[in-house]
């Protein structure tokens, strides 16, 4: 079901506020990767310990469907606000009581925030925009992912350089509070006693996991997430050790990733509705597969390595974002449940990738590229032969 679309000016303000909120959330999630070594040094543990925490975070991510009923019960806007409260609590905990345990708890709370915030936002937008414009609208909100790398991570690098690994946590909590106030002002609360709040959440979830069309599309998300995470958990160490980069330089190299992701998201916004969601996803998978295979062989010099990373993250982002509008309409009668389950599959992929990434890196960086390419390529036959786009 798609409700009456928002008027354009109102939707524009809502998109800006929601994107700001996503930049804050995703900065908290993503700053761990380039500064993994700095954080591990600050905690006095080896980098592999942080990678293990990331893998556990992915395992926790598979609990995302349990949060779907909360979104239905409290409403879309209130779920977003609740998610931001959870985020601020996790960030503040690390700032006040830094330890390996508090970092782990914060990781879990940041993911819990995403369980609440992102399905609520995507469901709200899907209910207020027609499918013919869904790729554009969801593609625009995904600027909150690249914006974290373009704006948030360089800011975190600056703060770490001026202070220590703890310095970014409290400012991020303050920005999370600001995002909550902004979203509460521009996005209205759901009407009371909505139909989706009364629906049987267990029955909806069972109908989702029994739908081969949905499961195939979500499996594609799992595969490409696993591929990307197997690179995420090692690229900071690869660049720092291989090219002798400082923390600030590592923060600046993430700008390359941010620009590539921004272009990938813009590509989905521009092309997904024109090409068709399924065709756009197949294009992204094919290009992403090729870029992973090529990356290890262009890493002899920093300039070529950054060019390879640019291609990898551009094509990955195009593929992962192209899947979102497609998934949002596979079962519109259970949209929030589908989107919550999508986060679980995405998190499962992250868990697999985090577990594999360090081990592959110990064998040689070339195996990170080969494994990521193979995992991404497995998604192509699923889209070709199983997934059918709902018109």
Language model features with spans:
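Juxtamembrane intracellular "pre-TM" segments in multi-pass secondary transporters
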Residues: 2-9, 189-217
């Amino acid at each position: 079901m798609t409700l009456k679309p928002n008027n354009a000016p109102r939707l524009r303000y809502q998109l800006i506020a929601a994107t700001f909120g996503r930049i804050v959330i995703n900065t908290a999630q993503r700053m761990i990767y380039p500064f993994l070594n700095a954080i591990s040094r600050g905690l006095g543990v080896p980098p592999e310990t942080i990678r293990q925490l990331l893998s556990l975070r992915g395992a926790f991510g598979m609990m995302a469907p349990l949060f779907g009923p909360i979104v239905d019960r409290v409403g879309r806007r209130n779920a977003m606000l609740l998610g931001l409260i959870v985020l601020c609590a996790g960030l503040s905990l690390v700032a006040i009581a830094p330890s390996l345990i508090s970092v782990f708890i914060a990781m879990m709370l940041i993911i819990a925030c995403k369980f609440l915030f992102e399905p609520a936002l995507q469901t709200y937008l899907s209910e207020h925009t027609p499918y013919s414009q869904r790729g554009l609208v969801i593609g625009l909100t995904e600027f909150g992912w690249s914006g974290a790398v373009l704006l948030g991570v360089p800011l975190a690098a600056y703060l770490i350089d001026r202070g220590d690994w703890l310095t970014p946590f409290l400012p991020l909590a303050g920005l999370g509070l600001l995002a909550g106030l902004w979203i509460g002002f521009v996005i209205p609360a759901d009407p009371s006693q909505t139909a989706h709040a009364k629906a049987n959440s267990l029955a909806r979830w069972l109908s989702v996991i029994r739908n081969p069309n949905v499961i195939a599309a979500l499996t594609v998300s799992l595969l490409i997430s696993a591929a990307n995470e197997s690179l995420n958990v090692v690229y900071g160490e690869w660049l720092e050790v291989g090219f002798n980069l400082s923390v600030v330089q590592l923060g600046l190299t993430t700008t390359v990733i941010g620009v590539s992701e921004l272009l990938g998201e813009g590509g989905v916004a521009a092309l997904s509705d024109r090409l068709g969601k399924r065709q756009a996803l197949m294009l992204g998978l094919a290009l992403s597969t090729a870029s992973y295979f090529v990356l290890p062989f262009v890493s002899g010099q920093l300039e070529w390595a950054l060019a390879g990373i640019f291609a990898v993250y551009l094509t990955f982002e195009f593929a992962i974002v192209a899947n979102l509008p497609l998934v949002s309409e596979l079962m519109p009668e259970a949209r929030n449940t589908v989107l919550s389950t999508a986060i679980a599959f995405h998190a499962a992929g992250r868990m697999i990738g985090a577990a594999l990434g360090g081990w592959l890196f110990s064998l040689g960086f070339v195996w990170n590229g080969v494994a990521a390419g193979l995992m991404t390529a497995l998604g192509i036959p699923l889209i070709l032969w199983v997934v059918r786009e709902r018109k």
